[in-house]
Each structure stands twice: as structure tokens, then as C-alpha cells.
Amino acid sequence: MANIKSAKKDSIISEERRKKNASQRSKMRTFIKKVRLAISSGDKEKSYDAFKKMQPIIDKYATKGLIHKNKAARYKSILSFKIAKLHKN
């Protein structure tokens, strides 16, 4: 436990940030799951719409530093490839 006043404030701020980051990570994962679910169901339009909603959220969190930019690019690349494959069939 912190004894210095500024250290106590820092621990409170750190806890608030941790909660916010966890919430945002959860939101991002939920959107990714929606895209994966739509792809696995085989619904072309639903998967494309879900992907369009997911993309700006992932980009936003990558620019803010919640996830690494390469991880964001990887998510988008893999899911867009699967959607393109779904549209070919």
C-alpha cells in the first residue's frame, strides 16, 4: 500500500485506467467474435456489415495504444481474407 499522497493518487488512476482498458478490450473482442460468428454461419452480408463495424474500432484502439498496430492489421487481414473467401463461394 502506498504511503505518499501522490503514490496513492497514482494507484487510483492506474486502477481506473485498468478498468477502462479492460472494458475497451472486451468491446473489441466482442466485435471480432461477431465477425467470426457471421463468417462461420456463411452469411455474406452479415459478415461484411459486422466487419465494417469492427474495422474503425480496431483502428481506434491501435492508434490509442490499447493494442499494437501490427495486431490490428493482422486481425483485419485475416478476417477480410475469410470474408473474401466466403464471397467467392
Swiss-Prot record:
GO biological process: translation
Biased composition (Basic and acidic residues): 7-18
Keyword RNA-binding belongs to the record: yes
GO cellular component, one term: small ribosomal subunit
Keyword annotations of the record: Ribonucleoprotein, Ribosomal protein, RNA-binding, rRNA-binding
Sections of the chain in a coiled coil: none
Function: Binds directly to 16S ribosomal RNA.
UniProt family annotation: Belongs to the bacterial ribosomal protein bS20 family.
Protein's UniProt name: Small ribosomal subunit protein bS20
